[in-house]
Regions:
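Mid-domain catalytic core of redox enzymes
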Residues: 1-76
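Histidine- and/or cysteine-centered catalytic micro-motif in compact active-site loops
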Residues: 28, 68, 87-89, 137
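C-terminal structured subdomain/cap of oxidoreductase catalytic cores
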Residues: 1-4, 11, 20-31, 79, ...
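Short conserved micro-motifs at the rims of enzyme active sites and ligand-binding pockets
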Residues: 33-38, 75-78, 93-98, 190-193
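Amphipathic alpha-helix from the class-I
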Residues: 88-104
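Flavin-binding catalytic cores
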Residues: 30-31, 56-58, 102-142
Length: 208
């Protein structure tokens, strides 16, 4: 970009905190009438965000489970494919984020955290460990590499503070013809808001 469009970004202005730890599970057998969406809460939701701000894996995370009853997502009627997500600190291998993240490439960390999430699910009444055929673990480091999101922070900048939602980059940039879309831009992260971000940019660009 031309230098006049490049604005220095300081840690106190743009802070990324939360990424996601994802488990993709292949399970034998079928769950009787599974809920498509399940949210398994820990004992204290507030402490989850204390851990994230401190840059450490959440001790007692909320676990989101998607168990779609969709024939297109499983090989046959005797198997299931689940998506599991917990909040996780952003990937920060060199401590460049001021201690606000974790080195998710550290040997053994991803698999250990995946085991812990499965144990938490079991403790909260959703034990699938004996049914597990295969799993893939995706960490904030993988998300950073795959999506180029800073630290794998899939929700963009921190949402702390009453004004945080208004500090996200606008969809129309100062550079003519350059538009911003996705979880790091207005209005924010998560599939519904990312879809809305795309709609806003579509309307800004106008018909071809």
């Amino acid at each position: 970009l031309p230098q006049r469009f490049v604005h220095p970004l300081h840690d106190e202005q743009v802070v990324v905190v939360a990424g996601g730890l994802v488990l993709l599970l292949a399970l034998r057998g079928r769950t009787a009438r599974p809920a498509h969406h399940s949210v398994l809460f820990g004992a204290d939701y507030d402490t989850e965000f204390d851990d994230l701000r401190a840059g450490r894996p959440v001790a007692d995370p909320t676990v989101y489970v998607s168990a779609p009853d969709d024939p297109a997502l499983r090989p046959d009627e005797d198997h299931e494919a689940w998506f599991v997500l917990v909040n996780a600190p952003a990937h920060d291998p060199a401590g460049e984020g001021g201690g606000r993240g974790t080195d998710w490439d550290a040997p053994g960390l991803a698999e250990a955290e995946a085991d812990r999430v499965l144990a938490l699910m079991a403790a909260r009444g959703l034990d699938v460990r004996e049914r597990l055929l295969w799993r893939e673990v995706r960490t904030p480091a993988d998300l950073a590499r795959g999506t180029r999101s800073d630290g794998g922070a899939i929700y963009g900048s921190s949402s702390d503070g009453a004004r945080a939602a208004f500090l996200r980059p606008a969809n129309r940039s100062p550079v003519p013809g350059l538009f911003l879309v996705g979880g790091s831009a207005h209005p924010g992260g998560g599939l519904p808001l990312v879809g809305l971000s795309a709609r806003i940019v579509t309307e800004l660009v106008g018909p071809a």
